[in-house]
Every structure is written in C-alpha cells, then in structure tokens.
C-alpha cells in the first residue's frame, strides 16, 4: 500500500462505464469517507466536468488531468501528472481516506503502476462482444476486481449471459469479479464491499 489515503485505479476501454462507476462510488461512499477523484482525459477534462455537474463531490475534491498521447502512459510508465494531482488534493484535504483515479479509455493491456494505485478495478462492456473475457489482457486477468458492465444489454447484442460469466470465471481464476449494470446501480454494493474489505476501510466506513 502507498502512504496516505487509499488509491483505487479505475481502468477500462472507452465507453465501458468508468465514469459511471466513479460517480456511483462517490454517491455510495462520500457520506461515509473523506474522498476525492482524479480523472484522466487525453485532451480535455470532460470526465471531471461530468462529475462536477453530477455534484457527487464538491468541485474542490475533483481534479482533471490532460494526459495527451496514450492514456496508459500517465497511469503506468510516467504517473507523475497523476501523482502531482494526488499531492495537491492531499494538501488541500489532509483528512482524505480514499482517492479514485479514473484512467482515460484504453485497451485491454492497460494497467496501473503500483506507485500510483493500491487497488485496481477494470471495467469491460458486455456490448463490446461475447469474446471480451476470452481476449484476456492484463486488465481482465490481473486487476484486483473485474467489473463486467451493461449485462442488461446482453440479449440486445447477441451475447449469452451464462457463457459470458463462465468465460469471465475462467479468465479470472481465483480473482473476484462483479456482473453489473452500473447505470442502474446493480453491482455497486458488491464493489463497495470489496473496497471496504480489501482497502482496510472497515472502521472508517462504519456508520456513525
């Protein structure tokens, strides 16, 4: 674990549901923990602005960084821009317990540097096709938690949900996963429980 607040990296391809997950986690945890968010976009701060519009956290607890080029570089090879944003948030809010770091959309090979994230969540999209879990990739196989999002779309895109979960189980082995519909809140309780358990947040998140 890094020093200071727990850092959770949220990765996945474009459109998989990373910002939706970030928003839902803020809604679920902001009343129980002191938390903040860092978003990564290639040339804009659109994801940060979306979170501000949703008012899931005060604006001064959200930082948007523009990575330029390949978004995976800013979360793996050279995480300095994200580390600077984290340092800024920690100075502004010394009581921080949790920081969510949302990566820019990338491919199945994107991973977070251990210098940047204590835990990683990887989000994939059911609508991207039946074979996504079978394609493996570090995001699918090595993340601390895999979230298979938009399972409600399976019948509309020719995906067999039973086979999708079986393939996910094979790809993950002993590592946990959640079948989710993030926009509708399905699976959020399981993801929150994972963060509390694996991130050592039990006492901090206990109801007052």
UniProtKB/Swiss-Prot annotation:
One of its GO terms (cellular component) is cytoplasm. Disulfide bonds: none annotated. GTP binds at residues 12-19. The keyword Cytoplasm applies. Its main location: cytoplasm. It holds the Pfam family cobW. InterPro entries: CobW/HypB/UreG_nucleotide-bd, P-loop_NTPase, UreG. One of its GO terms (molecular function) is GTPase activity. It is found in: Cytoplasm. The keyword GTP-binding applies. Facilitates the functional incorporation of the urease nickel metallocenter. This process requires GTP hydrolysis, probably effectuated by UreG. PANTHER family: UREASE ACCESSORY PROTEIN G (PTHR31715:SF0). Belongs to the SIMIBI class G3E GTPase family. UreG subfamily. Homodimer. UreD, UreF and UreG form a complex that acts as a GTP-hydrolysis-dependent molecular chaperone, activating the urease apoprotein by helping to assemble the nickel containing metallocenter of UreC. The UreE protein probably delivers the nickel. This is Urease accessory protein UreG.
